[in-house]
């Protein structure tokens, strides 16, 4: 795995070094005969301290960091658009301290209408990509307002979200207001399976062979409330087997509301308020957390939600708060409650230093604890428009 990571790093450095314009933030790299490629780098490093870590079970859902320094990720993205026909492509590589992986690598057919007028309102994606389930799962961690993902997402979608191998079709009917339907099918490909909340907990869906699939339907709409504010509403689903060698299934149902406000043409002040809920209807599941973790229990329904409000009140300062709860209902598992608050100093739109505090309440026999994060996140370069999901209103 380290050799694989070294090879990816060498390839990335060679690509960047191949052009004298590599440092430019507004230009892609010019590669002879092959047109333009947009390149960006994103570094995410933090220091974390937990209260009395000897008494904390670090298998708890929601803790992707360890005590001390963490190289959360160092991302390299290569994106572009072909001139011959309407196709965009993207590859997002993630480097950690001891391994490297492909976060996304896909082809995006954004103008199918040029192939046939019947397909004018359709788009398609094939490859490894982030599933359209809610808003949060679609963005990369450098766009997170806080250092860690919400508990409900970690529980059902994994600590870094779902981004498996498959295909997706979206349809935007030619009506007003805007509405979009999407349907994606994903399998594990060469990966171990569906992302689990922790290394020792069973995943929401069991993906053992290439024939095991998870289907993700979604519908969403977007409304311009005023010249400075907009509102997005979405409903998502996921269907798949929940145990190996079984036909028992889990159905995920999600809803999300995203409100954004920005004052005029400047990047500040602005508000981003995101609320999402996920519920799992499970047929005889293997329990993920609590006293019965790892055991098969009777059918149940378990769900959770979070609400996160970020406010950039000046050119350099932003404050964020999040409240989250898993246990509505709790089914066969323990309830979970966490409150987080963060303050960030923005050196630029792509470089920031943050301090975050979180309180994780008692969950079953796991005692409550506190955590403090110091995060440094910096980016360089540019991404081809249309190949990534961005929630910031600037």
Model-predicted regions and their roles:
Residues 255-257, 345, 368-394:
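Outer-membrane beta-barrel "beta-signal"
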Residues 51-57, 98-106, 138-141, 193-201, ...:
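Outer-membrane beta-barrel translocator domains and adjoining extracellular loop/strand segments
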Residues 310-361:
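C-terminal hydrophobic structural anchor segments
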Residues 41-49, 91-95, 126-128, 181-187, ...:
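Transmembrane beta-barrel strands of outer-membrane/channel proteins
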